[in-house]
A protein has these predicted regions:
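Generic anion/oxyanion-binding catalytic loop in active/binding sites
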Residues: 18, 58, 97, 130, ...
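Helix-rich "cap/lid" substructures immediately adjacent to catalytic or cofactor-binding pockets
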Residues: 2-87, 164
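Positions that flank functional sites
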Residues: 52, 91, 193-194
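Residue-level preference for short coil/turn positions at secondary-structure junctions
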Residues: 1-2, 82, 126, 158
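Alpha/beta catalytic cores of group-transfer enzymes, especially the acyltransferase/condensing modules
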Residues: 11-13, 40, 100-195
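A short small-residue
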Residues: 48-55, 95-96, 185-189
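Gly/Ser-rich oxyanion-binding loop with an adjacent helix/lid
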Residues: 62-132
Length: 198
Protein backbone atom coordinates (compact mmCIF):
# COMPACT_ATOMS: atom_id res chain seq x y z
CA UNK A 1 0.00 0.00 0.00
CA UNK A 2 1.16 3.55 -0.74
CA UNK A 3 1.58 6.33 1.73
CA UNK A 4 -1.50 7.99 3.21
CA UNK A 5 -1.79 11.76 3.61
CA UNK A 6 -4.48 13.56 5.56
CA UNK A 7 -5.04 17.10 4.30
CA UNK A 8 -7.24 19.30 6.47
CA UNK A 9 -9.37 22.22 5.25
CA UNK A 10 -9.31 25.82 6.33
CA UNK A 11 -12.21 28.11 7.04
CA UNK A 12 -14.74 28.13 4.25
CA UNK A 13 -15.27 24.35 4.24
CA UNK A 14 -17.88 24.48 7.02
CA UNK A 15 -21.53 23.56 6.56
CA UNK A 16 -24.43 22.77 8.82
CA UNK A 17 -24.57 19.02 9.45
CA UNK A 18 -20.83 18.44 9.24
CA UNK A 19 -19.77 15.56 11.46
CA UNK A 20 -23.33 14.65 12.49
CA UNK A 21 -23.30 11.14 11.05
CA UNK A 22 -19.95 10.44 12.70
CA UNK A 23 -21.26 11.76 16.03
CA UNK A 24 -24.37 9.59 15.81
CA UNK A 25 -22.57 6.40 14.77
CA UNK A 26 -19.17 6.54 16.49
CA UNK A 27 -18.48 6.70 20.23
CA UNK A 28 -15.03 8.07 19.35
CA UNK A 29 -16.46 11.02 17.42
CA UNK A 30 -19.09 11.63 20.11
CA UNK A 31 -16.41 11.77 22.80
CA UNK A 32 -14.33 14.25 20.79
CA UNK A 33 -17.30 16.56 20.22
CA UNK A 34 -18.41 16.32 23.85
CA UNK A 35 -14.95 16.88 25.37
CA UNK A 36 -14.12 19.74 23.01
CA UNK A 37 -17.51 21.36 23.77
CA UNK A 38 -16.75 21.20 27.47
CA UNK A 39 -13.21 22.53 27.02
CA UNK A 40 -14.26 25.58 24.98
CA UNK A 41 -17.58 26.09 26.78
CA UNK A 42 -19.57 25.96 23.56
CA UNK A 43 -22.22 23.50 22.35
CA UNK A 44 -20.38 22.26 19.27
CA UNK A 45 -23.06 19.67 18.57
CA UNK A 46 -25.73 22.38 18.22
CA UNK A 47 -23.34 24.61 16.29
CA UNK A 48 -22.42 21.90 13.77
CA UNK A 49 -25.65 19.93 13.48
CA UNK A 50 -28.55 22.40 13.83
CA UNK A 51 -29.57 25.11 11.34
CA UNK A 52 -27.90 28.35 12.39
CA UNK A 53 -25.96 31.30 11.04
CA UNK A 54 -23.23 31.12 13.70
CA UNK A 55 -21.48 28.30 11.81
CA UNK A 56 -20.25 30.98 9.38
CA UNK A 57 -18.98 33.39 12.05
CA UNK A 58 -15.23 33.04 12.47
CA UNK A 59 -15.21 32.85 16.25
CA UNK A 60 -17.37 29.71 16.01
CA UNK A 61 -16.40 28.34 12.60
CA UNK A 62 -12.81 27.58 13.44
CA UNK A 63 -13.36 25.43 16.51
CA UNK A 64 -16.30 23.69 14.79
CA UNK A 65 -14.15 22.75 11.77
CA UNK A 66 -11.25 21.62 13.93
CA UNK A 67 -13.50 19.43 16.08
CA UNK A 68 -15.21 17.89 13.06
CA UNK A 69 -11.91 17.22 11.30
CA UNK A 70 -10.33 15.65 14.37
CA UNK A 71 -13.42 13.51 15.05
CA UNK A 72 -13.41 12.16 11.48
CA UNK A 73 -9.65 11.59 11.60
CA UNK A 74 -9.89 9.62 14.85
CA UNK A 75 -12.67 7.43 13.45
CA UNK A 76 -10.52 6.69 10.39
CA UNK A 77 -7.50 5.92 12.57
CA UNK A 78 -9.63 3.56 14.68
CA UNK A 79 -10.53 1.74 11.45
CA UNK A 80 -6.88 1.31 10.55
CA UNK A 81 -6.53 4.27 8.20
CA UNK A 82 -3.62 6.23 9.64
CA UNK A 83 -1.75 9.09 8.04
CA UNK A 84 1.91 8.85 7.13
CA UNK A 85 1.88 12.62 6.70
CA UNK A 86 -0.57 15.39 7.49
CA UNK A 87 -0.98 18.93 6.22
CA UNK A 88 -3.54 21.65 6.51
CA UNK A 89 -4.54 24.92 4.94
CA UNK A 90 -4.49 27.76 7.48
CA UNK A 91 -6.80 26.54 10.27
CA UNK A 92 -6.20 22.99 9.02
CA UNK A 93 -2.60 23.25 10.21
CA UNK A 94 -3.88 22.80 13.77
CA UNK A 95 -5.58 19.55 12.73
CA UNK A 96 -2.32 18.43 11.14
CA UNK A 97 -0.53 19.11 14.44
CA UNK A 98 -3.07 16.90 16.21
CA UNK A 99 -2.63 14.22 13.53
CA UNK A 100 1.15 14.33 14.08
CA UNK A 101 0.68 14.03 17.86
CA UNK A 102 2.38 17.41 18.27
CA UNK A 103 -0.68 18.86 19.99
CA UNK A 104 -3.62 17.19 21.69
CA UNK A 105 -7.07 18.01 20.40
CA UNK A 106 -8.24 19.73 23.59
CA UNK A 107 -5.31 22.17 23.51
CA UNK A 108 -5.89 22.64 19.79
CA UNK A 109 -9.61 23.34 20.36
CA UNK A 110 -8.80 25.93 23.04
CA UNK A 111 -6.15 27.60 20.87
CA UNK A 112 -8.38 27.65 17.79
CA UNK A 113 -11.32 29.00 19.78
CA UNK A 114 -9.17 31.94 20.94
CA UNK A 115 -7.76 32.35 17.43
CA UNK A 116 -11.27 32.60 16.01
CA UNK A 117 -12.34 35.15 18.63
CA UNK A 118 -9.27 37.33 17.99
CA UNK A 119 -9.68 37.10 14.23
CA UNK A 120 -13.37 38.02 14.50
CA UNK A 121 -12.50 41.03 16.66
CA UNK A 122 -9.93 42.16 14.09
CA UNK A 123 -12.25 41.73 11.10
CA UNK A 124 -15.95 41.97 11.99
CA UNK A 125 -18.38 39.92 9.90
CA UNK A 126 -19.02 41.39 6.47
CA UNK A 127 -15.93 43.62 6.34
CA UNK A 128 -13.45 41.23 4.74
CA UNK A 129 -13.80 38.54 2.14
CA UNK A 130 -12.05 35.96 0.02
CA UNK A 131 -12.71 34.49 -3.42
CA UNK A 132 -11.34 31.38 -5.11
CA UNK A 133 -10.29 32.06 -8.68
CA UNK A 134 -10.11 29.00 -10.93
CA UNK A 135 -8.67 28.53 -14.36
CA UNK A 136 -6.52 31.66 -14.53
CA UNK A 137 -2.75 31.89 -14.14
CA UNK A 138 -1.42 33.72 -11.11
CA UNK A 139 0.19 36.43 -13.24
CA UNK A 140 -3.18 37.12 -14.90
CA UNK A 141 -4.92 37.31 -11.53
CA UNK A 142 -2.27 39.67 -10.20
CA UNK A 143 -2.75 41.89 -13.28
CA UNK A 144 -6.55 41.80 -12.99
CA UNK A 145 -6.54 43.00 -9.38
CA UNK A 146 -3.52 45.34 -9.57
CA UNK A 147 -5.57 48.55 -9.72
CA UNK A 148 -8.15 47.56 -7.12
CA UNK A 149 -7.37 48.89 -3.63
CA UNK A 150 -7.44 46.57 -0.62
CA UNK A 151 -7.31 43.23 -2.44
CA UNK A 152 -4.39 40.86 -2.89
CA UNK A 153 -3.51 37.24 -3.58
CA UNK A 154 -3.82 35.30 -0.32
CA UNK A 155 -3.32 31.63 -1.21
CA UNK A 156 -1.72 29.83 -4.11
CA UNK A 157 -3.73 26.65 -3.46
CA UNK A 158 -2.60 24.77 -6.55
CA UNK A 159 -2.06 25.46 -10.23
CA UNK A 160 -5.40 26.71 -11.47
CA UNK A 161 -6.81 27.73 -8.07
CA UNK A 162 -5.75 30.91 -6.34
CA UNK A 163 -7.53 32.78 -3.56
CA UNK A 164 -7.76 36.55 -3.39
CA UNK A 165 -8.48 38.40 -0.18
CA UNK A 166 -9.23 41.87 1.14
CA UNK A 167 -12.07 44.28 1.76
CA UNK A 168 -15.26 42.49 0.74
CA UNK A 169 -16.29 44.99 -1.96
CA UNK A 170 -12.77 44.96 -3.40
CA UNK A 171 -12.72 41.17 -3.50
CA UNK A 172 -16.07 41.11 -5.30
CA UNK A 173 -14.71 43.62 -7.82
CA UNK A 174 -11.51 41.56 -8.17
CA UNK A 175 -13.50 38.37 -8.77
CA UNK A 176 -15.42 40.11 -11.57
CA UNK A 177 -12.19 41.42 -13.12
CA UNK A 178 -10.74 37.90 -13.01
CA UNK A 179 -13.81 36.53 -14.82
CA UNK A 180 -13.43 39.25 -17.44
CA UNK A 181 -9.76 38.21 -17.78
CA UNK A 182 -10.81 34.63 -18.57
CA UNK A 183 -11.16 32.86 -15.22
CA UNK A 184 -13.25 29.71 -15.53
CA UNK A 185 -14.88 30.45 -12.15
CA UNK A 186 -14.64 33.02 -9.38
CA UNK A 187 -16.37 31.94 -6.18
CA UNK A 188 -16.82 34.10 -3.10
CA UNK A 189 -15.85 32.01 -0.08
CA UNK A 190 -18.01 31.68 2.99
CA UNK A 191 -15.59 33.56 5.25
CA UNK A 192 -15.67 36.99 6.82
CA UNK A 193 -11.90 37.34 7.04
CA UNK A 194 -9.21 38.54 4.78
CA UNK A 195 -5.46 38.31 4.85
CA UNK A 196 -5.11 42.04 4.35
CA UNK A 197 -6.78 42.68 7.73
CA UNK A 198 -4.72 40.26 9.81
Amino acid sequence: MGKIAFVFPGQGAQKVGMGKEFYETSPIAKEIFDKASEAVELDLKALCFEENDDINITEYTQVALLTTSVAIMEVLKDRGIKPDVAAGLSLGEYCALVAANSMNYIDAAKAVRKRGIYMQEEVPAGVGGMAAIMGLESTEIEKAIADIPQVQVANYNCPGQIVISGKKESVEQGAEKCKEAGARRAVMLNVSLSLIHI
